[in-house]
């Protein structure tokens, strides 16, 4: 029987629903009884999902990038009336017609050609995110456990670690480095819609909405897109994994997940038996989006797999495997290139199976990235004043630390990055000379203190006060970081999966909004209080709940718990901020209604503790600052 669910009224209910979608899909898929889900559109178009989608999008750095209609998240969504925006999104779901996307061309790393990035209109981004929120747990429950690209709590480091781990376990050294020609441009819409249906999306209305998303035209080029999924669309990464899921299943069904009549005590015993008594060709797949590698035991089998996969892609997915770029490599002799790293094995007697892994940053890619950083550093000389210089230095440091974090899993990463240290120092010193730039020991600068305090390397820095300096960090400040294999059970959609994530990262998921969802009765109450001014916009109603989370449901004035939604007021700490800043979570303080009146001098101090009175006076002063 096809499943249907109650529409969530709070973000807590939404998360419970996501868990349920995941668990039902997982259990029924494993037993072969999966029938899919209907009634998904009502969930996607619910007030709760819409608000969660808006919150997710506004947290991304590209939220303010306009689409073809010129509208942005802050001006045209967050600063508008709450009920009007929710109603507008819901109307869009009923008769969905996406606007054409704005195409932007960005350089391909190491190539003269550029790749297209499609930027949807902001309303289309919200619709896409609503769809993604509901579909992701259904798809995640079915995806291949060693697919790592565009998936929550998975990354490139885990994909690389899986390759290293599997090589050491099975002792195979032949690798097929897969290259699918122009994958995102050649996704067949009909095939993709059929795959969504077979993976449980049995709501025809949702399938039609996704089809409309895929066919959205490109401004100034075509009115309807016949092929491909636009790179830059929020839902595109999920759809890409859906499209390649059947390839994952087909390859793993041939070896890794081969069903046998005999039940074995371990997978190792099963594989040994398959070796002895079958003609199957060993294959271990690791995929990161459209980048994939396949590990096998001989050149002959590697070439057979290459040919078979090329045929499968052509016949079943209408895709082309680039035979020239899809390489067959023996990693004992030559490194492979995967996700910006090179990887091979070298002989060492004490290592497992006599070979140790050697991982390095891919030299040409790292060099390009560092050249971009050096260009940014040289542009520091154009800064108008010190404040602008400090802002740019912080951005440059973030880029350098980002590169270090990405390549920290490589052997001897400190030596690889140290090669750029002197050049960064010299270029930065030259660029900052007019701003009083000088060389300062790293442990004496005032930025990135927890990092710089461990080094005495001289950094190019500018003075910002008495004995205080802001410096351009060094790429040499890095250490090797051990990565561990991904536990497939780690997922945001189960209690066990979230516990594993906490154990690995010590990071908890963001708490759900503490709603009282803003129903018509709640909005009526707020209107009765006169909260219809421009500052009481969608952003206010959204962030007041996240402020309550941050304050752990306690009043910032009296310190007592806020247990009744009707008694909760979100106080604007500084009232004279512009509309773009006044409703940020940092400017909202959770209070009881009576405590809020005390802050504004509308209530007598009688009955309040001395501490509460002092807090109220403190916040009253901030109102005028």
Which ranges hold each PLM region?
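Non-catalytic, polymerase-adjacent accessory regions of viral genome-replication enzymes
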Residues: 1-82
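Duplex nucleic acid-engaging cores and interfaces of nucleic-acid transaction enzymes
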Residues: 2, 117-132, 140-143, 147, ...
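Active-site and adjacent loop segments of nucleotide-processing enzymes
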Residues: 2-20, 24-31, 299, 337-546, ...
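Reverse-transcriptase-like RNA-dependent polymerase core
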Residues: 54-57, 88-112, 122, 126-134, ...
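Short hydrophobic/aromatic beta-strand micro-patches
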Residues: 76, 120, 295-297
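Conserved polymerase palm-domain catalytic core
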Residues: 85, 100, 145-146, 151-154, ...
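Histidine-centered nuclease catalytic patch
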Residues: 179, 559-590, 603-604
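Short cysteine-rich loop/turn motifs with clustered Cys
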Residues: 539-568, 592-594
């Amino acid at each position: 029987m096809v499943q249907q669910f109650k529409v969530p009224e709070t973000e807590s209910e939404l998360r419970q629903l996501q868990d349920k979608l995941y668990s039902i899909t997982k259990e029924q898929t494993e037993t072969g009884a999966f029938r899919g889900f209907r009634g998904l559109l009502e969930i996607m178009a619910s007030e709760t999902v819409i608000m969660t989608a808006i919150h997710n999008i506004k947290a991304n750095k590209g939220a303010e990038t306009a689409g073809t209609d010129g509208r942005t998240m802050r001006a045209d969504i967050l600063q508008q009336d709450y009920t009007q925006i929710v109603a507008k999104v819901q109307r869009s779901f009923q008769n969905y017609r996406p606007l054409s996307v704005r195409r932007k061309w960005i350089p391909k790393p190491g190539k003269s050609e550029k790749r297209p990035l499609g930027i949807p209109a902001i309303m289309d981004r919200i619709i896409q995110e609503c769809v993604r929120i509901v579909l992701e747990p259904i798809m995640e429950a079915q995806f291949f456990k060693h697919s790592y690209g565009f998936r929550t709590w998975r990354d490139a480091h885990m994909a690389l670690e899986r390759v290293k781990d599997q090589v050491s376990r099975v002792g195979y050294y032949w690798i097929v480095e897969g290259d699918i020609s122009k994958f995102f441009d050649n996704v067949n819409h009909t095939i993709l819609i059929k795959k969504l249906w077979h993976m449980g999306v049995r709501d025809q209305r949702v399938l039609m909405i996704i089809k409309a998303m895929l066919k959205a035209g490109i401004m100034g080029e075509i009115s309807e897109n016949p092929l491909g999924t636009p790179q830059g669309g929020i839902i595109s990464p999920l759809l890409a994994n859906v499209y390649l899921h059947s390839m994952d299943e087909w390859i793993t069904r041939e070896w890794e997940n081969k069903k046998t009549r005999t039940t074995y005590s371990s997978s190792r015993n099963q594989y040994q038996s398959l070796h002895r008594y079958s003609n199957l060709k060993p294959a271990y797949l690791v995929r990161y989006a459209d980048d994939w590698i396949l590990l096998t035991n001989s050149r002959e089998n590697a070439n057979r797999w290459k040919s078979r996969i090329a045929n499968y892609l052509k016949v079943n997915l209408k895709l082309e495997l680039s035979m020239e770029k899809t390489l067959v490599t023996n990693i004992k002799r030559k490194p492979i290139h995967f996700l910006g790293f090179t990887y091979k094995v070298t002989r060492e007697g004490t290592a497992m199976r006599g070979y140790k892994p050697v991982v390095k940053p891919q030299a040409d890619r790292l060099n390009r990235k560092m050249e971009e950083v050096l260009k940014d550093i040289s542009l520091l000389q154009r800064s108008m004043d010190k404040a602008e210089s400090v802002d740019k230095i912080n951005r440059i440091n973030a880029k350098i630390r980002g590169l270090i974090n990405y390549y920290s899993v490589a052997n001897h990463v400190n030596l690889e990055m140290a090669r750029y240290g002197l050049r960064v120092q010299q270029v930065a010193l030259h660029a900052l000379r007019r701003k009083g730039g000088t060389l300062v020991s790293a442990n004496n600068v005032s930025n990135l203190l927890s990092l710089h305090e461990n080094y005495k390397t001289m950094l190019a820095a500018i003075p910002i006060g008495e004995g205080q300096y802001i410096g351009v960090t060094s790429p040499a400040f890095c250490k090797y970081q051990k990565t561990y294999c991904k536990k497939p059970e780690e997922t945001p959609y189960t209690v066990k999966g979230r516990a594993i994530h906490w154990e690995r990262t010590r990071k908890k998921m963001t708490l759900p909004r503490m709603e009282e969802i803003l129903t018509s009765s709640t909005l009526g109450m707020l209107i009765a209080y006169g909260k219809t001014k421009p500052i009481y916009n969608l952003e206010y109603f959204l962030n007041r709940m996240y402020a309550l989370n941050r304050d752990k449901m306690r009043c910032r004035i009296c310190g007592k718990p806020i247990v009744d939604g009707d008694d909760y007021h979100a106080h604007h700490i500084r009232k004279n901020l512009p509309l773009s800043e006044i409703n940020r979570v940092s400017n909202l303080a959770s209070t009881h209604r009576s405590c809020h009146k005390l802050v504004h001098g509308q209530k007598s101090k009688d009955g309040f503790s001395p501490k509460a009175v002092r807090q109220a006076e403190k916040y009253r002063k901030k109102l005028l600052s």
